[in-house]
UniProtKB/Swiss-Prot annotation:
It comes from Polaromonas naphthalenivorans (strain CJ2). It catalyses: D-erythro-1-(imidazol-4-yl)glycerol 3-phosphate = 3-(imidazol-4-yl)-2-oxopropyl phosphate + H2O. This is Imidazoleglycerol-phosphate dehydratase. Belongs to the imidazoleglycerol-phosphate dehydratase family. The keyword Lyase applies. It comes from the Bacteria. Pathway: Amino-acid biosynthesis; L-histidine biosynthesis; L-histidine from 5-phospho-alpha-D-ribose 1-diphosphate: step 6/9.
């Protein structure tokens, strides 16, 4: 009885990935089927706040610790966190059997509204239209949002469309983008019990 029950349990969708370069040292641990718990330390306060949105709204347990060359700027740290997070997601997803594959979300915050659509297609691609109203959000360079998502898609092997439809406050714009990204991920990463052993593509592979 115990053996049968254990055999019927789905494999945990977890991963741990480290990236060490001359510019950054990063470790990402995650559980795609978590409850949104997070432990985050990148040295960039606003970026930690955005990563927390991914954990909380994606219901992903996320542990990210990064040490980077912030005496230069945040570029390498933000981009490399995106790369490492993408690698961890790809590892945790595995063969994609039963995956819903597609996810989308609209998220508002006061005057700001963003839409994000994701496809675990196996083909990296980013289309991002976010006209930030300010170059800096705290100590976070708003241009680095693009670098984060580009790093993520290249290594998670997803197609990602991000559109900020309305917004006058850069903080609100960024927050709606990251929250919508999280909720789109949550949808796409769900397992469809009706197709639990099927790869969601007519090709038979992704």
């Amino acid at each position: 009885m115990t053996t049968s029950t254990a055999a019927s349990l789905p494999a945990p969708r977890t991963a741990e990935v480290s990236r060490n370069t001359a510019e950054t040292k990063i470790t990402v641990k995650l559980n795609l089927d978590g409850t949104g718990q997070a432990s985050l330390s990148t040295g960039i306060g606003f970026f930690d706040h955005m990563l927390d949105q991914i954990a909380r709204h994606g219901l992903i347990d996320l542990d990210i610790h990064a040490v980077g060359d912030l005496h230069i700027d945040g570029h390498h740290t933000v981009e490399d966190v995106g790369i490492t997070l993408g690698q961890a997601v790809a590892q945790a997803v595995g063969d994609k059997k039963g995956l819903r594959r597609y996810g989308h979300a609209y998220v508002p915050l006061d005057e700001a509204l963003s839409r994000v659509v994701v496809d675990f297609s196996g083909r990296p691609g980013l289309v991002m239209n976010v006209p930030f109203k300010s170059g800096m959000i705290g100590t976070f360079d708003s241009q680095l949002a693009y670098e984060f998502f580009q790093g993520f898609v290249n290594h998670a092997f997803v197609t990602l469309h991000i559109d900020n439809l309305k917004g006058e406050n850069a903080h609100h714009q960024a927050e709606t983008v990251f929250k919508a990204f999280a909720r789109a991920l949550r949808m796409a990463l769900e397992i469809d019990p009706r197709a639990a052993n099927v790869i969601p593509s007519t090709k038979g592979s992704l």
